[in-house]
UniProtKB/Swiss-Prot annotation:
Alphabetical list of InterPro entries matching this protein: HAD-like_sf (IPR036412), ISN1 (IPR009453)
E.C. no: 3.1.3.99
SUPFAM superfamilies membership: HAD-like
Species the sequence originates in: Schizosaccharomyces pombe (strain 972 / ATCC 24843)
Cofactor: Mg(2+)
Family the UniProt entry places it in: Belongs to the ISN1 family.
Annotated Mg(2+) binding sites: 147, 149, 365
One GO CC term on file: nucleus
Residues noted as binding IMP in the record, renumbered to the chain: 147, 149, 155, 183, 333, 341
Protein name: IMP-specific 5'-nucleotidase 1
Coiled-coil region(s): none
Membrane-spanning segments: none
Amino acid sequence: MASRYRVEYALKQHRKDDFIEWIKGLLSVPFVLQAGTPSQKLVTREKEQETLERYAVILRDVEKLIEAHIQIVSEGGSYSQLKMLVPSITIFWTPLPLVKAMYALEPKLCLAKRSFVAPSFNDVRAILGGAQLNYLADNGLDMVSFDGDVTLYEDGQPLLPDNPVISRLIQLLSRGIYVIILTAAGYPSRTGQEYTDRFSGLLQAIEDSDLKDGQKRKLHVLGGESNYLFAYDPLHGLQWVDADSWMLPVMKTWPHDEILEILDTAEETLRSCIQGLNIDAKIVRKERSVGFVPSLGQKLRREQLEEAVLETQATLQIRNFSVPFTAFNGGNDIWCDIGDKKLGVLCLQHFFNISHPSRCLHVGDQFLSAGNNDYKARAAATTVWVSSPHETIEFLDYYFSFLKK
């Protein structure tokens, strides 16, 4: 049976990451040259080191290409050698110590002991994430934003008290780092009750913790991509933050008529998709978002979801709206939000007076370019791409382990 990642990442052009695929291709050469026979699973230490060093040679070259790209972009240039090799490359906020990350992750990845499975998409993704966390551990981190579903908790579930990620979030707060749940879920109520219910396990744990009040106040929730901000108060829980104090000036000038036109156009497109693709779902319209959710007990097919989100994106892009929007696949529903996570991260940096994107991290599970709402955060902060809440915990533990060295 084909794995989920083979279906998602290998067969669908719009679901590929060119940079990861390029590195994977580079690493396939030493794999072929160094692959052993089936009887060599327990290879010698000398053989392992030789194999890893071949991978390291390539990753060192990639490190140098990234550093050169950063330098050229900082000087106002646009075309580096890396850009020519991977045309879709945009910006790196920091160098990436890929070799160090590979060696640190080798006990988990077992790259040197594999004879039949070459370094994969997931292996490269893990090395990139590990390298980013390694750099941040050495150079400082002021803010971490997390997607919600499939990053902190399973899709559609609340953040319950027994979720092991909670202790890691509290550890970040204890170090004076801003922790933000940056979620697409948009609830415009000023009471914040929906977010309080959704994140009750975390909020209760913070209340019961020995964190200082100043550390507790560093927890925030930004909902609807970049629309509703709530700050944690030690006495009153999540409290509404007025938009005038944290939204970027340009966001305050967005024409209300254009926002309505975007939502109307998206709603019309989604209704057409429901009818044309025989989707058993209903439209949900909110103040700054519109989407469809399946009827009770229904599970929508991936192809239906992808077709709907891509058609919605294309329809809106043709109209050339000035107001940013995000159309994305939520796993079993489709949504179109006003704003995006790039703006969300930029708003937070402005609100917290953080000097540079290199001191901010966004962790999420949706970084492919089409129909995925974490992708745009790359333009505002460093990022780590996870595939599950368990991986989020692993990466955070990896970060903490490097802080101790």
